[in-house]
């Protein structure tokens, strides 16, 4: 964002002009959009433990075989690994949200995840369902009007949903 400000100032300075109302309005909109992005990311980050825990509870309620003997989340070690992976995915979704770009999610989290899960025998469909459950909860927190700067956040909420969709698709 600072680069955008520097660019506008440099252009005005090169012309020997003050910033125009149009330029100021564009910068103001960029700041407002950035504030919404910050608010949404803060809401997701502040509620990360709740998002992950509730998604896991819901998943294991729907698929109890995962936590029964022989299931992929059976034993404390496997359960902890499952919760850790869910938290990592959520963390990288929050990074993509603040950056407004999925490359950090793709490059540092999702690339190779399907292959890793297949090699470990982790059921991708179950992970995808857990991601979907996290998506629902995270969007509810991010879209809570008490947490977000006033204004239309529908485009941002839609963008956040696509990050979760990318993650769910990456594991199946």
Swiss-Prot record:
<dbReference type="InterPro" id="IPR009050">
    <property type="entry name" value="Globin-like_sf"/>
</dbReference>
<keyword id="KW-0602">Photosynthesis</keyword>
<feature type="binding site">
    <location>
        <position position="39"/>
    </location>
    <ligand>
        <name>(2R,3E)-phycocyanobilin 1</name>
    </ligand>
</feature>
<keyword id="KW-0042">Antenna complex</keyword>
<feature type="binding site">
    <location>
        <position position="72"/>
    </location>
    <ligand>
        <name>(2R,3E)-phycocyanobilin 2</name>
    </ligand>
</feature>
<keyword id="KW-0488">Methylation</keyword>
<keyword id="KW-0793">Thylakoid</keyword>
<feature type="binding site">
    <location>
        <begin position="82"/>
        <end position="88"/>
    </location>
    <ligand>
        <name>(2R,3E)-phycocyanobilin 2</name>
    </ligand>
</feature>
<keyword id="KW-0934">Plastid</keyword>
<comment type="subunit">
    <text>Heterodimer of an alpha and a beta subunit, which further assembles into trimers and the trimers into hexamers. The basic functional unit of phycobiliproteins is a ring-shaped hexamer formed from two back-to-back trimers contacting via the alpha chain subunits. The trimers are composed of alpha/beta subunit heterodimers arranged around a three-fold axis of symmetry. The phycoerythrins also contain a gamma subunit which is located in the center of the hexamer.</text>
</comment>
<keyword id="KW-0813">Transport</keyword>
<dbReference type="GO" id="GO:0030089">
    <property type="term" value="C:phycobilisome"/>
</dbReference>
<feature type="binding site" description="covalent">
    <location>
        <position position="82"/>
    </location>
    <ligand>
        <name>(2R,3E)-phycocyanobilin 2</name>
    </ligand>
</feature>
<feature type="binding site">
    <location>
        <position position="35"/>
    </location>
    <ligand>
        <name>(2R,3E)-phycocyanobilin 1</name>
    </ligand>
</feature>
<feature type="binding site">
    <location>
        <begin position="149"/>
        <end position="151"/>
    </location>
    <ligand>
        <name>(2R,3E)-phycocyanobilin 1</name>
    </ligand>
</feature>
<comment type="function">
    <text>Light-harvesting photosynthetic tetrapyrrole chromophore-protein from the phycobiliprotein complex (phycobilisome, PBS). Phycocyanin is the major phycobiliprotein in the PBS rod.</text>
</comment>
<comment type="similarity">
    <text>Belongs to the phycobiliprotein family.</text>
</comment>
<keyword id="KW-0150">Chloroplast</keyword>
<dbReference type="GO" id="GO:0015979">
    <property type="term" value="P:photosynthesis"/>
</dbReference>
<keyword id="KW-0157">Chromophore</keyword>
<keyword id="KW-0249">Electron transport</keyword>
<dbReference type="InterPro" id="IPR038719">
    <property type="entry name" value="Phycobilisome_asu/bsu_sf"/>
</dbReference>
<feature type="binding site">
    <location>
        <position position="77"/>
    </location>
    <ligand>
        <name>(2R,3E)-phycocyanobilin 2</name>
    </ligand>
</feature>
<dbReference type="InterPro" id="IPR012128">
    <property type="entry name" value="Phycobilisome_asu/bsu"/>
</dbReference>
<dbReference type="Pfam" id="PF00502">
    <property type="entry name" value="Phycobilisome"/>
</dbReference>
<dbReference type="InterPro" id="IPR006247">
    <property type="entry name" value="Phycocyanin_b"/>
</dbReference>
<keyword id="KW-0605">Phycobilisome</keyword>
<feature type="binding site" description="covalent">
    <location>
        <position position="153"/>
    </location>
    <ligand>
        <name>(2R,3E)-phycocyanobilin 1</name>
    </ligand>
</feature>
<keyword id="KW-0472">Membrane</keyword>
<dbReference type="GO" id="GO:0009535">
    <property type="term" value="C:chloroplast thylakoid membrane"/>
</dbReference>
<feature type="modified residue" description="N4-methylasparagine">
    <location>
        <position position="72"/>
    </location>
</feature>
<protein>
    <recommendedName>
        <fullName>C-phycocyanin beta chain</fullName>
    </recommendedName>
</protein>
<keyword id="KW-0089">Bile pigment</keyword>
């Amino acid at each position: 964002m600072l680069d955008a400000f520097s660019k506008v100032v440099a252009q005005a300075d090169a012309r020997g002009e003050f910033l125009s109302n149009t330029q100021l309005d564009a910068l103001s909109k960029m700041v407002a959009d950035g504030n919404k992005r910050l608010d949404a990311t803060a809401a997701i980050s502040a509620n990360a433990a709740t998002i992950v825990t509730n998604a896991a509870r819901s998943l294991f309620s729907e698929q109890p075989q995962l936590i029964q003997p022989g299931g992929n989340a059976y034993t404390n070690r496997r359960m902890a690994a499952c919760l850790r992976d869910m938290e990592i995915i959520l963390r990288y979704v929050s990074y993509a949200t603040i950056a407004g770009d999925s490359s950090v999610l793709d490059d540092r989290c999702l690339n190779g995840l399907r292959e890793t899960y297949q090699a470990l025998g982790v059921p991708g469909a179950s992970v995808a369902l857990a991601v979907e459950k996290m998506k629902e909860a995270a969007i509810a927190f991010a879209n809570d009007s008490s947490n977000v700067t006033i204004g239309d956040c529908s485009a941002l909420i839609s963008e956040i949903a696509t990050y979760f969709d990318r993650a769910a698709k990456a594991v199946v």
